[in-house]
Structure formats: structure tokens, C-alpha cells
Amino acid sequence: MVENPLLKVLLDRKSVRKFKPTQVSREAVEQIVRTGQRAPTACRVEAYSFILVSDLEKRKQIVGATVGHAPTRRFMEEAPVWIMICTDFARQIKFLEMQGLKNEFSEVSKFMLGIIDAALAAENMVIAAEALGLGSCFVGSIWTAPKGVAEILNLPENVLPVVLLCIGHPDENPQTRSRWPLEAVLHENEYNMPDERLMLEHASARQNWEVSSPYKLPRDVEQRIRREWREQGFLI
């Protein structure tokens, strides 16, 4: 494998869930966000916004609306930096209106391209944090409470919370977690289902893992999330 410092940062990345109380400088936070902006973006729309959540009361409300008393709560409360990553078309729609142009975003493209833009920016930000010697962890359950988070952060229509990025100085050095073998995820010209040998090897590496709760949403919860997405202007 080619030796490269950037590749090393990428390959060594792991989620950190225990942080030192040391504050992260504003300069570092802004550098991380600027790095997020350098991610690829569809048609240069930059369909994202980043909300730095420093208000402790707002943090408490977000925890209550999303993770409740789950184990996730502890590392969220310890993390010095919270960055809420949102899909944002409100800014672009306003930008078009100021120029006398019509908003012609289709609902499907608005949802898909917005999520992709936000996700690409989020990954850039994680790598930037790693390069600065910081640890980070995503809180994915944010998307299960779009209305609650939107109300807490005063998000207008056409802005949707996607994921929360927690950042801080790491107070642990966890091992990198196993991934599927490359031959199970890299296909050429057509899809091939991994054979049973790879499946068993992967099961052994993951031990007692099971599909986590965000993938097991009850039907009524799924319907509620879809309704709240629509209320934020995303008709999926």
C-alpha cells in the first residue's frame, strides 16, 4: 500500500465517544467548517448549513428530543463542540428570488442532492478534525426528530437537520472497527453477492452485533418522520 499521510488519517479514523473537557478553539472550528465547504457539491448550490450549538439549554432540549436516556447521551453531553449539519435550500431559494429567478428544484432532487451535499461536507469535516488531532462522532438519530430539532434551532422551511457532529479532544483511543472485506464491497461491471465464507468471516468479526435501533423504526414512527419532513418542505 502507498504510504501517504492523508491516507493514514483516513484509514485510522474511528469514532470517539469520550472527550476531555478542554475547549476547542474557534479558529479550529471555523477551519473544520471551511473544509466541509470544499467538499463536492451539486451544481455549486452548497445545499447545507452548519449550526454551532453552544447554548447548553438548546443542547439539553436536542438530547431530549432525539436520544433521550440512551447511552449516546453521555458522550453528547461531554463533547465541547456540536455542529448540526443541515440540508439547506432556503438560502438558495432566497438567492434565486433576489435575482428574479424561479425556484425550479424538483422535490426528489431537492431531497437527494441536499442529503448528498450535507453528507459529503460532513465527512470532510470529520477528516479535518482528525487532521487537527481532534476526535469526533456522528449522532445519526437527529433525523428521527426533524420537527423537534427544527423548532429548537429555529430552522425555516426548506432546511432539514441531517446529522449532529460532536467534536473534542479525545480522552480515549479506541481500536478501529472491522469492515467488510474488500472483495465483498468492490464489484466489477456487475453486482455479486458475497459468498457464505465472507458472510461467516464478517459475522465472526462483528461478534454480537445486531441491526441498531434507527433501522428498526415502528411504522407509526416512520410515518411521523415523513410528515415532519414534509412540514419542513421536503415532500418525500
Specify the residue positions occupied by each region the protein language model found:
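Acidic, surface-exposed loops and disordered segments
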Residues: 1-236
